[in-house]
Structures are given as C-alpha cells and as structure tokens.
C-alpha cells in the first residue's frame, strides 16, 4: 500500500551548493520484517544516487488496517 504525493518543492544541499526542484513523496506501508526488501526495491528504481529512504516507527496502528496489511503482505 503506497501513497504518492507529487509536485513537492524540495530544497537541499548537494555537492556543496543549495539545490531545489520538484520531487514526489512516496509513503509505503509495510512491516518491520519487510523494510530491507522495500529499501532495496526503492533504491533499484530510484534515479538518485542517494534517495532519502526512511523507516519511521509507529506509536499506533489501527487493528483492522494491521490485519489487512498482514493479509496482503503474505
């Protein structure tokens, strides 16, 4: 399950200079045991040398959503 938020303005330092441009934000929901595989897949598809891939721990996940996610991740 992913959400793609297009047309975001990004400002960052790269190679010693401030860069800016349009990017998209991908939010992918998965389990901790799938993070490594997801990271590898995103890196293989991404055009950047060093994409910002973050795993954020959650304080709460709705039980129905967690069940659905488990059923669909296999």
What are the roles of these predicted feature ranges?
Residues 1-74:
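Positively charged, small/polar-rich N-terminal and surface patches that mediate targeting and assembly
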């Amino acid at each position: 399950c992913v959400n793609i938020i297009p047309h975001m303005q990004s400002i960052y330092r790269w190679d010693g200079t401030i860069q800016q441009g349009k990017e998209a934000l991908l939010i992918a929901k998965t389990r901790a045991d799938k993070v490594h595989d997801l990271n590898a897949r995103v890196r293989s598809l991404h055009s950047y040398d060093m994409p910002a891939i973050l795993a954020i721990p959650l304080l709460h996940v709705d039980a129905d959503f967690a069940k659905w996610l488990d059923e669909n991740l296999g």
